[in-house]
């Protein structure tokens, strides 16, 4: 047997440790070996090993009881002693374990011939109780032989044995029991049973001389890698004895297999195991096998002679025991290398085990030809038919090279498989019942193994490696068939997998050498790949068995379970891109090192839990009983779940085995059946009904529609059309068909077809299959087609499908066909028209609409003509009638539509549960540099708008008519431009979040909507195909607007003359006037002169706009200096010019200089007077630069700033001004010699003046000290002279800087708008306006602003995250900008480094992400539909997804599609959604739009608008009726029409008068207009939320934040008022969810006539008892005992208490707090109406209530409770009620309240409901949906009908319907 143990040791790399010194004998409690013999000159006395239970109080005594285990051990988390899953108690049916002396004369031990020099283990005898077995003659020898034939590299080691003689005889076995007193009792076991025992002998010459009557045992050794301390057992000795535990009686017999089940406990999911037992009554019962906290441990030492390569191959013996019971014995063995887990199995009777799993006959074995035992033996295969012959032993190195996994088998049909080799853990023995087949392996391994550092092939599939620590596994494999005696192992493991972890050890090896750690990741290559990938190139030591060894002191490679040293490299200067790559590598590394547990989301906020429970309910098919459950939790909105679908009548044709095997889940099958069932019906118009699958993203719509196609295919309808949004989804369609069991249905791409007959020869004669097309290809046309009949794709499809054919048309992702009936001012989309035309042309087709967002808004349902909601003989004749009715009634009407469609069997909408999914909105703080850049862009846009308007106003009517679309283009570009700026502000935060997620062992998905590819390509074309920097998308948008859409006319460009060629001929005075106006505010605008003059010296200031301001103003100053000194050399003054400037601009610049020379000269002279006449000597060049920069900062229109100057300083400055000008003018940093001048000398004087240590050191030191004293004296004198001057200039600079900053950040609107006028046409002379000149000036301004604008967001993100090698990009663009290793930026096609075409690059990137090769994915709209990026259980990359929404989609359908990429079925964990929103108020416009769409989506698509309230974006939803009223109030307040403002203006607005500034700003963005009289008016269509939130993007940051804050305050106030009035629309109203007692009193049923179709509507009369008696109030009071909890009294009459009565209330805190101020919230329970749904703070309560004692409240409570039974609250408090005095029943404050609910097919009687609800005044009142749950647990959802309308509604329904009757409830 020890050859197997040695093989396991070798597999773990521990075989070289097997040579040990002989242990010291001990006689105490030992087992003596009576047959010690000498084998091959090596005498060995075996050591003893004692079993004991660590839970025993006397664990080291020989009487300790050893618990036999039926299952493997599982180690504890902290590396402690492994514990068994199954303990043993009085009824477990244990066995007695004894050790017995070995007997000479037999070489058959444990069914395996002993291997000489093998590892020694104690002899164990396992004695089952209550069973007898034939005795065995232990003395009969058995001498089978074996011949080993080695072969070359990668030997496949297999052996075979023939039948061995069965021992016979009736020899009694003697066992000794050693009690606690140390005495031994001898007893004979032959009358009881023959013991089974496990015994290991030793041999060095290949002979076995020890008898064996043992059970078959399959040992297994696991290397231990955790340090543990052990003490020597008192029983450790070389002598032998026997230990028998106390006998147990009355134990049941175990039978059958172990049953595993998973249950939910308080600690989470746990796996339990049940074992079948036969009790004393003969009954078969199952008992839970409980874990025990201890294990049996054997302690001993290794005997000598345990060398490598000395093992022989054992042969099988015969099982003697006939009881048919298998037992597993597991123990911990303590060897010199720490603990080793030894597992032995006792197999059933008649089983023989051989090393290669053979049965001994006709099986091949291997013979060693030369008798060598090296690792490179040549093996050849032979076959024996009789007794195996003996051969030379095979070395361990040769044997452990087999990585396929040795199989041990037996004749009884059991296979014992040695699995887990090289899987990062150690080898395990595994048994599995087989069908009496041979277990021979005769094929070469094909997996990757490691031997002597080389990669080899090995057949064993790698086991799963634990992500947290190295692990070994017990893996059950399915029974495998055999072919010619060979076992073909199943690749798929069985269900039961028990894994345990290493007890890791850092113990040094006994050889005395350095501590080593085995690299045991052969099969998975995890260690090697990481080591090689990490650049590990050191020479590693090699073990004697050929294994690679590395020092244990080396740094651990993350996740590899091994160590590897890190290379020490010299740091090199890195570029920004290289730094980004290194940071991403570091994030990957940290992510692997830190195995963070997944955060549990069970403890959520109370409000979230409440919202989830109220909004959703777990979904199970209501009328379907077949099919397997969906792999993930699926929910349905509560309102939809209250409606039952119709009965199932359709008989499905899909084979049952596909359904039973889970190819389609039950809820998917439900949609298939209902769709096919609906397809059997016809509409009144004769068209076939369609079906709408509204399941959310990730539920599995693709597989559902694939099954619908499959079902129709089985019915003989073999042609189908599948329309989707992306050609990449064709592969998903094929996958879905394959997964649902229809792999043979072909799928063809329409865009690959020629424009000809599809069934013709040109297209391959396609007669049947699925024609896959995109919506974009559907509108394709080809005028060059041979036949006009096939010129368009839709005509091709119609011809191929057949006009009368009844096949399936799938409109997948049908939200792309929306906007068939768009809003005013837009045109229907061509896609929508094509979809409508296709349905009309094929009236018999079976149409399926499939989309998670198919009905985002009712207007987008226009193409769903097959749902029967409108049309001939429907409730709505035309779609216009339907849309007007639904939109007028709001969200409640949409909920009714969704419920009605489900009730008709037209619609199902389920979605994945949001459990485990977290949502967060994170606002990004804006930097000051970004704010400056943003405000500069705002100024440029304001000036552009002013110039657009000015030029258009000067045109006549005819010219103006050609510019109708200019403003549409302008505002569209305006929105895009600032959207790009908003996104750019979030890039840094996004990169930081991404790196943190990678470090936290997660992966990242970033959502974008646009890629900016068009801007990149446009710029690339302009630059001639070469780019050296990232393209600014924002700059391209603005530049393109001015360049392409600025209104210029030929009459304004002086006829046919070229304005640029004749630029010199323009009148100078006009330009001079413009220049004067421009120059005066350049310091405030943030631009330099309009020609783009810059200088190279200003670059040291900083980044962004500050840099531009400095450069530009430095240029102005230098130009002024040039003019004042008479230097006309413009090249020196104009060192750098803008790209848009041409030669003519230089002359214009000269004019500007001459016009402003005096002003600038005065400014410069003032600066020179302040600074003094400095030279460039004595290392002060840096001071010159500082002076120049200070000059640039102080340059402004206030050139006559008040600077206090001394007269002497003035004269000194004047005398030296000429010299200074000359030096500054001639200064060129590239022409000066700085070798002798150190600009940092004044900061490093001590370093410069330190003398070298030479012979003249002292003298030089004295000289230097003297020179230093002189310099210090001069310096102090200079400082004194300049002290006053510097103080004065600093004082002036601070004042100016303060004014500038206030103007930039919080300047008044007048100053801000004035400073934005770059193009001066303020004279009002129309002759001075030249559009081409203005256009040129605007383009030049754009170029000056461009350096500070952000680059393309997508390219910047990829670059900062390490480049394309780390980021998987799934977008629609063809190329991207990449940074090379040298830092150069270049344009590259996306598939440049890939092996796939550009069409498949997205799929390739997706696969890399799902495989974990890339952990960051960026998706755009092109990849948003259909692509699955969730943590799929089938994927390699199972990390949790962090979905960062960098750019919020503009519509809900796009948002839902993006959210659904990472939240789908079959996922390991739900994603984390992070919505990044900058603090720019205008950007909340996008959040508002998405939130509004999500709310509407939840209402219509999922029947409940609150379904999306868990998404945090709902707080930004302003686009509702409250927002619209608030906007109207805001606009009227700003222009002064609203009188007293509803809300006071923001107090923190300090820039100016708030309303006055907002008027100017809102005029600047087109929201307000000023008429001829100077009065402000509201622009047409300005009072819309989207336009308002879009336009305020164009305001400076401080202004838009203040304005949006003011707008939000108005919205909050309006909502608060509506809640106070009780008119706030909260969605679906719930009855019966709290303590209310709800009963259905009466139901009136109405059924439709035949001509009106079959429908059914019901009016329910619901009674609600909501009062709370005094006894119930006291019970509630006892549960709340805080200080503020208790009874309160209120006087509703106020001061008039004499004529009014008191009302009581019970107030108690509920633990919630307000989100705004953190105040605790309290619930209010009244005696008449119960608990109020409105929560209040104590501050609000104190205004109306005061606390009283219980006795005082009791009387008031009872009186109010009794009165509420028959009067309203008005009568009770005031003694009268105005409502009842008018003859109307008043229910306010009554204990019992009556509701009337209209349910059923409400859409069928919608016109009647509409007429009744509108009333006589035709007001558009809201439609309140109510959900009722009665005491009888009945659910009713419908419309709430007011009591005043009930009588009229009943009359109208009786007239319209064919029959009505009353159903009274008991």
Curated annotation (Swiss-Prot):
Keywords noted in UniProt: Nucleus, Transcription, Transcription regulation
Disruption phenotype: RNAi-mediated knockdown results in embryonic or larval lethality. Surviving animals exhibit slow growth, gonad migration defects, vulval induction defects and reduced lin-3 expression. Larvae that develop into adults are sterile, and only few produce embryos. RNAi-mediated knockdown in males results in tail defects including underdeveloped tails, spicule defects and missing rays. RNAi-mediated knockdown in a lin-3 e1417 mutant background abolishes vulval induction.
Keyword Manganese tagged: no
Entry's localization field: Nucleus
Biased amino acid composition, Polar residues: 37-63, 134-146, 191-203, 210-228, 566-577
MF-aspect GO terms: chromatin DNA binding; histone binding
Gene3D superfamilies: P-loop containing nucleotide triphosphate hydrolases
Biased composition (Acidic residues): 1142-1152, 1194-1213
Coiled-coil regions, chain positions: none
Region (Disordered) residue spans: 19-63, 132-151, 156-253, 561-581, 1112-1308
Biased composition (Low complexity): 19-28, 161-176, 229-239, 1112-1126
Keyword Transcription: yes
GO cellular component, one term: nucleus
Distribution of this protein across tissues and organs: Expressed in the somatic gonad, neurons, hypodermal cells, seam cells, the excretory system, and intestinal cells (at protein level).
GO terms classed as biological process: nematode male tail tip morphogenesis; positive regulation of cell fate specification; positive regulation of Ras protein signal transduction; regulation of DNA-templated transcription; vulval cell fate specification
Segments of skewed composition (Basic and acidic residues): 1164-1177, 1262-1281, 1290-1304
A Pfam family: Helicase_C_4
Family: Belongs to the SBNO family.
Function: Transcriptional activator that functions upstream of the let-60/Ras and let-23/EGFR signaling pathways to positively regulate lin-3 expression and thereby promote vulval induction. Plays a role in excretory duct development. Plays a role in male tail development.
Name of the featured protein: Protein strawberry notch homolog
Organism: Caenorhabditis elegans
Taxonomic path: Eukaryota, Metazoa, Ecdysozoa, Nematoda, Chromadorea
């Amino acid at each position: 047997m020890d050859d197997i143990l040695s093989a396991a040791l070798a597999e773990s790399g521990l075989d070289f440790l097997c040579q040990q010194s002989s242990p010291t004998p001990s006689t105490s409690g030992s087992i003596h070996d009576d047959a010690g013999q000498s084998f091959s000159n090596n005498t060995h006395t075996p050591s003893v090993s004692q079993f004991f239970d660590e839970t025993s109080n006397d664990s080291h005594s020989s009487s300790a009881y050893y618990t036999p285990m039926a299952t493997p051990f599982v180690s504890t988390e902290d590396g402690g002693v492994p514990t068994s899953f199954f303990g043993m108690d009085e009824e477990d049916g244990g066995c007695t374990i004894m050790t017995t002396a070995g007997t000479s004369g037999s070489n058959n031990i444990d069914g395996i011939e002993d291997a000489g020099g093998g590892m020694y283990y104690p002899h164990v005898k396992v004695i089952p109780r209550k069973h007898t077995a034939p005795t065995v003659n232990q003395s009969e020898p058995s001498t089978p032989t074996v011949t080993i034939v080695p072969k070359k590299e990668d030997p496949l080691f297999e052996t075979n044995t023939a039948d061995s003689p069965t021992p016979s005889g009736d020899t009694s076995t003697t066992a000794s029991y050693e009690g606690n007193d140390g005495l031994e009792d001898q007893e004979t076991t032959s009358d009881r049973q023959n013991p089974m025992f496990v015994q290991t002998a030793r041999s060095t010459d290949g002979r076995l001389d020890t008898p064996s009557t043992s059970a078959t045992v399959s040992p297994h050794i696991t290397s231990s890698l955790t340090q543990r301390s052990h003490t020597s057992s008192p029983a450790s000795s070389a002598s032998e004895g026997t230990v028998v535990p106390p006998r147990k009686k009355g134990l049941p017999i175990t039978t059958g297999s172990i049953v595993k089940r998973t249950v939910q406990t308080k600690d989470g999911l746990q796996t339990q195991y049940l074992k079948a037992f036969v009790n004393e009554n003969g009954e078969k019962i199952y008992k839970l096998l409980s874990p025990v906290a201890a294990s049996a441990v054997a302690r001993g030492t290794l005997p000598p002679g345990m060398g490598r390569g000395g093992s022989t191959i054992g042969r099988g013996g015969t099982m003697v025991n006939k009881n048919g019971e298998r037992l597993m014995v597991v123990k911990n063995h303590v060897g010199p290398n720490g603990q080793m887990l030894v597992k032995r199995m006792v197999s059933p009777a008649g089983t023989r085990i051989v090393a290669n799993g053979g049965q001994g006959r006709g099986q091949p074995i291997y013979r060693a030809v030369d008798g060598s035992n090296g690792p490179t033996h040549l093996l050849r295969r032979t076959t024996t038919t009789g007794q195996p012959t003996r051969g030379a032993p095979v070395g361990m190195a040769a044997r452990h090279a087999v990585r396929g996994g040795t199989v041990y088998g037996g004749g009884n049909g059991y296979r014992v498989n040695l699995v887990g080799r090289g899987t990062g853990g150690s080898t395990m023995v595994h048994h599995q019942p087989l069908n009496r087949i041979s277990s021979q392996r005769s094929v070469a391994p094909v997996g990757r193994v490691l031997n002597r550092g080389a990669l080899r092939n090995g057949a064993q599939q790698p086991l799963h490696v634990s992500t947290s620590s190295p692990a070994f596994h017990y893996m059950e494999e399915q029974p495998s068939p055999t072919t010619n005696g060979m076992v073909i192992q199943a690749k798929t493991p069985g269900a039961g997998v028990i894994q345990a972890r290493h007890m890791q050890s850092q113990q040094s090896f006994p050889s005395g050498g350095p501590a080593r750690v085995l690299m045991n990741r052969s099969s998975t290559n995890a260690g090697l790949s990481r080591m090689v990938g990490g650049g590990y190139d050191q020479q590693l030591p090699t073990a004697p068995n050929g294994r690679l060894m590395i020092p244990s002191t080396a740094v651990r490679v993350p996740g590899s379970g091994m160590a590897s040293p890190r290379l020490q490299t010299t740091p090199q200067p890195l570029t920004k891109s290289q730094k980004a790559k290194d940071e991403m590598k570091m994030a990957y590394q940290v992510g692997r090192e830190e195995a963070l547990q997944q955060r549990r989301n069970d403890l959520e906020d109370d409000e979230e839990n409440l919202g989830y429970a109220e909004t959703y309910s777990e979904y199970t098919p209501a009328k379907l009983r077949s099919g397997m459950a969906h792999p993930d939790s699926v929910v349905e909105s509560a309102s939809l779940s209250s409606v039952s679908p119709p009965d199932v009548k359709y008989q499905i044709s899909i084979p049952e085995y596909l359904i039973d095997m889970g190819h389609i889940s039950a809820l998917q099958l439900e949609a298939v059946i209902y769709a096919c069932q609906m397809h059997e019906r016809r509409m009144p118009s004769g068209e076939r009904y369609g079906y709408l699958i509204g399941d959310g993203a990730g539920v599995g719509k693709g597989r559902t529609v694939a099954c619908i196609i499959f079902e129709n295919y089985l019915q003989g309808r073999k042609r189908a059309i599948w329309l989707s949004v992306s050609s990449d989804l064709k592969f998903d369609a094929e996958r879905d068909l394959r997964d649902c069991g229809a792999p043979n249905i072909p799928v063809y791409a329409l865009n690959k077809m020629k424009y000809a007959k599809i069934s013709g020869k040109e297209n391959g004669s396609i007669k049947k299959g699925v024609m896959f097309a995109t919506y974009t290809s559907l509108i394709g046309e080809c005028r060059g087609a041979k036949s006009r009949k096939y010129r368009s794709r839709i005509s091709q499809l119609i011809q191929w499908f057949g006009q009368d054919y009844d096949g399936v048309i799938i409109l997948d992702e049908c939200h792309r066909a929306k906007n068939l009936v768009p809003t005013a001012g837009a045109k229907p989309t061509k896609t929508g028209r094509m979809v409508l035309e296709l349905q009309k042309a094929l009236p018999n087709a079976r149409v399926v609409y499939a989309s998670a967002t198919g009905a985002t808004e009712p207007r987008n349902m226009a193409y769903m003509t097959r749902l029967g909601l409108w049309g001939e003989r429907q409730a709505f004749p035309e779609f216009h009638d339907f849309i007007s009715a639904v939109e007028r009634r709001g969200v409640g009407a949409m909920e009714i539509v969704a419920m009605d469609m489900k009730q008709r069997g037209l619609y199902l909408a389920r979605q994945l549960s949001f459990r485990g999914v977290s949502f967060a909105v994170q606002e990004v703080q804006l930097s000051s540099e970004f704010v400056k850049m943003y405000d500069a862009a705002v100024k440029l846009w304001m000036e552009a708008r002013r110039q657009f308007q000015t030029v258009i106003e000067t045109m006549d009517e005819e010219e103006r008519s050609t510019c109708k679309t200019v403003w549409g283009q302008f505002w569209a570009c305006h929105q895009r431009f600032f959207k790009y700026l908003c996104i750019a502000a979030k890039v840094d935060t996004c990169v930081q979040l991404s790196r943190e997620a990678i470090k936290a062992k997660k992966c990242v998905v970033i959502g974008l909507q646009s890629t900016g590819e068009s801007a990149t390509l446009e710029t690339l074309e302009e630059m001639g195909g070469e780019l050296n920097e990232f393209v600014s998308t924002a700059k391209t948008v603005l530049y393109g607007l001015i360049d392409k859409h600025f209104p210029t006319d030929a009459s304004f460009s002086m006829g046919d003359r070229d304005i640029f060629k004749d630029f010199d001929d323009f009148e100078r005075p006009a330009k001079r006037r413009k220049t004067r106006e421009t120059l005066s505010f350049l310091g405030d605008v943030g631009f330099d002169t309009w020609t783009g003059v810059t200088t190279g010296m200003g670059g040291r200031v900083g980044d962004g706009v500050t840099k531009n301001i400095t450069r530009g103003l430095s240029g102005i100053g230098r130009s002024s200096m040039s003019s004042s000194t008479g230097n006309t050399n413009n090249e020196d003054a104009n060192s750098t010019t803008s790209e848009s400037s041409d030669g003519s601009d230089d002359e214009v610049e000269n004019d500007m200089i001459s016009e402003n020379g005096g002003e600038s000269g005065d400014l410069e002279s003032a600066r020179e007077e302040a600074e003094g006449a400095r030279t460039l000597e004595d290392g002060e060049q840096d001071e010159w630069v500082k002076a120049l920069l200070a000059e640039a900062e102080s340059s402004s229109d206030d050139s006559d700033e008040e600077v206090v100057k001394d007269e002497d300083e003035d004269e000194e400055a004047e005398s030296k001004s000429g010299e200074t000008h000359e030096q500054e003018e001639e200064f060129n940093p590239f022409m000066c010699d700085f070798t002798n001048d150190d600009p940092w000398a004044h900061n490093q004087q001590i370093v410069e003046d330190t003398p070298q240590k030479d012979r003249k050191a002292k003298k030089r030191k004295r000289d230097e000290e003297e020179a230093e004293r002189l310099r210090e004296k001069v310096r102090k004198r200079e400082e004194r002279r300049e002290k006053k001057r510097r103080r004065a200039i600093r004082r002036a600079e601070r004042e100016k800087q303060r004014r500038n900053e206030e103007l930039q950040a919080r300047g008044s609107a007048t100053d801000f708008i004035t400073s934005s006028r770059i193009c001066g046409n303020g004279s009002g002379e129309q002759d001075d306006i030249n559009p081409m000149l203005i256009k040129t000036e605007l383009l030049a301004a754009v170029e000056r602003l461009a350096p500070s604008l952000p680059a393309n967001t997508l390219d910047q993100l990829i670059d900062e995250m390490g480049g394309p090698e780390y980021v998987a990009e799934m977008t629609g663009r063809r190329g991207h900008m990449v940074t090379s290793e040298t830092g150069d930026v270049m344009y590259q096609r996306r598939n440049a480094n890939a092996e796939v075409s550009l069409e498949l690059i997205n799929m390739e990137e997706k696969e890399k992400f799902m495989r974990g090769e890339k952990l960051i994915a960026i998706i755009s709209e092109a990849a948003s539909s259909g692509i699955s990026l969730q943590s799929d259980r089938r994927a390699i990359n199972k990390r949790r997804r962090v979905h960062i929404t960098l750019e919020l989609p503009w519509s809900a359908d796009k948002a839902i599609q993006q959210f659904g990429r990472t939240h789908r079925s079959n996922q390991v964990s739900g994603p984390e959604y992070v919505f990044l929103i900058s603090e720019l108020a205008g950007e909340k416009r996008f959040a508002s739009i998405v939130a509004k769409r999500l709310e509407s989506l939840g209402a219509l698509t999922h029947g409940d608008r609150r379904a999306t309230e868990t998404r945090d974006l709902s707080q930004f939803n302003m686009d509702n009726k409250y927002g619209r009223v608030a906007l109207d109030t805001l606009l009227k307040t700003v222009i002064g029409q609203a009188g007293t403002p509803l809300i006071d203006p923001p107090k923190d607005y300090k820039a100016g008068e708030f309303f006055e500034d907002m008027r100017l700003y809102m005029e600047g963005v087109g929201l307000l207009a000023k008429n001829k009289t100077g009065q402000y008016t509201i622009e047409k269509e300005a009072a819309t939320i989207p336009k308002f939130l879009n336009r305020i993007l164009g305001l400076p940051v401080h202004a838009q934040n203040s304005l949006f804050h003011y707008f939000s305050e108005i919205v909050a106030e309006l909502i608060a008022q509506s809640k106070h009035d009780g008119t706030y629309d909260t969605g679906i109203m719930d009855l019966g969810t709290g303590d209310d007692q709800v009963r259905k009193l009466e139901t009136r049923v109405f059924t439709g006539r035949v001509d009106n179709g079959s429908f059914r509507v019901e009016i329910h009369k619901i009674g609600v008892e909501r009062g709370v008696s005094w006894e119930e109030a006291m019970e509630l009071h006892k549960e709340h005992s805080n200080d503020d909890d208790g009874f309160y009294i209120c006087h509703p009459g106020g001061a008039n208490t004499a004529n009014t009565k008191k009302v009581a209330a019970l107030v108690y805190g509920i633990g919630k707090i307000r989100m705004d101020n953190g105040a605790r919230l309290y619930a209010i329970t009244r005696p008449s109406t119960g608990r109020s749904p409105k929560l209040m703070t104590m501050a609000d309560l104190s205004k109306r209530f005061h606390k009283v004692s219980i006795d005082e409240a009791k009387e008031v409570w009872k009186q109010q409770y009794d009165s509420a039974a028959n009067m309203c609250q008005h009568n009770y408090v005031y003694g009268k009620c105005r409502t009842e005095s008018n003859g109307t029943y008043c229910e306010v404050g009554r204990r019992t309240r009556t509701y009337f609910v209209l349910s059923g097919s409400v859409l069928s009687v919608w016109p009647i409901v509409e007429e009744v609800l509108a009333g006589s005044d035709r007001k558009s009142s809201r439609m309140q949906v109510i959900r009722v749950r009665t005491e009888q647990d009945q659910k009713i959802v419908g419309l709430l009908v007011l009591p005043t309308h009930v009588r009229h509604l009943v009359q109208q329904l009786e007239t319209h319907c064919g029959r009505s009757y009353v159903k009274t409830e008991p």
